[in-house]
């Protein structure tokens, strides 16, 4: 909304047009806005969650150090999502259908995560929303969204899979392959980030890094000058540049949330945050046609999810034998004696390295 205000004011005050005409300025402003909103609302929300006794449930078979986390306020993801939506409504171009799609993803997956958390933490339902019901909701939405994105993106012929570190290698995709790939990316990312969110600050830093990386790609690919110079396919779809603005909002809010989520965590994001942020990253990767770059930058999430799949598979197929001491894999390292902070920081370092590798693919082609 503010871009329309500044556009009107620029007729009377010289210089204000930068806030409406330059997406780079809006990227900076939305990141600052989302950061400040999250910082401002963080303490009141934590206090409210404490009064409502909406606290973390800790597994009895987990690391003993986690027992101190019991009853730590949860569902802090509402803070992140609210900040992102408010910031986008303030600084986003509201004529962009891609921005509205991302906001819809936040609302839909946020509702699933919120209901799951509500069942577990408020109604004390031990398992929350049943896995099959959760997967069904995610799947229906992801398939419908994938079909919509196919028709939106295909208007400008942007239906090829970009291969990292290659100047001209693209794999064309029809609607079936596109929808299947998008389905697995969106659902897989949503659940992988959810599994990663098990230690203080562990998930939010990789989320911010991946969002920043995808935002950089979105900015390059929707700028004809940069895209041509760096030999990327120019994504000229009207409104697609707002993806970079949305990514900046996620980064700002995520960094501010880390202020409260760092060890010892004062609040956890819960399923309402992790499921939604994972889904959003997957949708963004599909929008900017950088699914493989997303795989590289988000490889930490992939490893966390694979560790759970391997653990479950081994337990069922090998008569109760496990590969890891506990899954997801971050708990395995805890049970090996690594302090929680060391696990988290080392995983952050890995995520930073993956982020830099993903950025290197911009120029190393």
UniProtKB/Swiss-Prot annotation:
One Gene Ontology biological process: cell division
Reaction(s) the record says it catalyses: UDP-N-acetyl-alpha-D-muramoyl-L-alanyl-gamma-D-glutamyl-meso-2,6-diaminopimeloyl-D-alanyl-D-alanine + di-trans,octa-cis-undecaprenyl phosphate = di-trans,octa-cis-undecaprenyl diphospho-N-acetyl-alpha-D-muramoyl-L-alanyl-D-glutamyl-meso-2,6-diaminopimeloyl-D-alanyl-D-alanine + UMP
Pathway: Cell wall biogenesis; peptidoglycan biosynthesis
Entry membrane topology: Multi-pass membrane protein
GO CC field: plasma membrane
Molecular function per GO: metal ion binding; phospho-N-acetylmuramoyl-pentapeptide-transferase activity; UDP-N-acetylmuramoyl-L-alanyl-D-glutamyl-meso-2,6-diaminopimelyl-D-alanyl-D-alanine:undecaprenyl-phosphate transferase activity
Protein name (record): Phospho-N-acetylmuramoyl-pentapeptide-transferase
């Amino acid at each position: 909304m503010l871009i329309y205000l500044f556009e009107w004011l620029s007729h009377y005050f010289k210089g204000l047009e930068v806030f409406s005409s330059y997406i780079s300025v809006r990227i900076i402003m939305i990141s600052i806005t989302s950061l400040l909103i999250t910082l401002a609302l963080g303490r009141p929300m934590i206090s409210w969650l404490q009064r409502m006794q909406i606290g973390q449930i800790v597994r009895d078979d987990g690391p003993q150090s986690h027992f101190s986390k019991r009853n730590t306020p949860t569902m802090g993801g509402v803070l992140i999502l609210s900040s992102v939506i408010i910031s986008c409504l303030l600084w986003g171009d509201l004529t962009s259908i891609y921005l509205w799609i991302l906001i819809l993803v936040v609302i839909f997956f946020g509702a699933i995560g919120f209901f799951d958390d509500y069942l577990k933490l408020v109604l004390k339902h031990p398992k929350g929303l049943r896995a099959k019901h959760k997967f069904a909701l995610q799947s229906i939405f992801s398939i419908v969204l994938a079909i919509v994105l196919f028709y939106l993106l295909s208007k400008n012929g942007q239906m090829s899979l970009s291969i990292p570190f290659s100047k001209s290698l693209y794999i064309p995709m029809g609607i079936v392959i596109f929808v299947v790939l998008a389905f697995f990316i969106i659902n897989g990312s949503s659940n992988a980030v959810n599994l990663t969110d098990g230690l203080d600050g562990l998930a939010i830093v990789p989320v911010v890094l991946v969002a920043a990386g995808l935002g950089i790609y979105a900015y390059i690919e929707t700028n004809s000058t940069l895209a041509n110079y760096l030999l990327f396919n120019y994504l000229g779809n009207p409104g697609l540049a707002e993806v970079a603005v949305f990514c900046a909002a996620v980064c700002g809010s995520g960094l501010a949330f880390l202020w409260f989520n760092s060890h010892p965590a004062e609040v956890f994001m819960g399923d309402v945050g992790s499921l939604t942020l994972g889904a959003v990253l997957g949708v963004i990767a599909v929008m900017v046609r950088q699914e493989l770059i997303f795989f590289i930058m988000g490889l930490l999430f992939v490893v966390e999810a694979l560790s759970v799949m391997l653990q479950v598979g081994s337990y069922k197929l090998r008569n109760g034998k496990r590969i890891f001491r506990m899954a997801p894999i971050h708990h395995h390292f805890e049970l090996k004696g690594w302090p929680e902070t060391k696990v988290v920081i080392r995983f952050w370092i890995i995520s930073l390295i993956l982020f830099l590798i993903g950025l290197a693919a911009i120029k190393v082609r």
